[in-house]
Amino acid sequence: MSDERDERTGLFILNTGNGKGKTTAALGVLMRAYGRDMKVIMLQFIKRRGSRLGEHLAAEKMGVEIVPLGDGFTWRSDDIEKDRQLARKCWETCQDKILNSDYDLVILDELTYALTYRWLSVDEVLTTIALRPRWMHVVVTGRDAVPALVEAADIVTEMLEIRHSFKKGIPGQIGIEF
């Protein structure tokens, strides 16, 4: 693994936009990296601790780390200060995994929301990503990525919603949405 790391240039990848597929695309990268014997982790900002969604069930079967750190917090919260503090705590965990671990791939799922709502410092996040080991890939997902994040990323993909079954009244489907 060290020889491969010596030859690797870590990428900063951003999946953003209002369409479906940001987390799903990041999970695809996770699968490819894991298949190449890379050490991988996905840290989820909004999904609740103890979540048992499809990706958590699959990760458990495979022995892959997908760690929900949130409590479902959103901008519609009853206690914004509590959510800000939780986002900060989530970020500290992410920062530790980026700076003090030997992961080859770190995915920060739904991080963009914490930046959009100014719960975290964009400069601090970008500095941490810049200070990662040179061989580490970082993927960030979420809607409404702030311009500085878009500018800093090596690869930016914007998911565009053209049509979604929700608008037809079809509820989220097991294995597709969760």
Predicted regions and their residues:
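Glycine-rich phosphate-binding loops of nucleotide-dependent enzymes
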Residues: 107
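Generic detector of well-ordered alpha-helical packing
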Residues: 45, 110-111
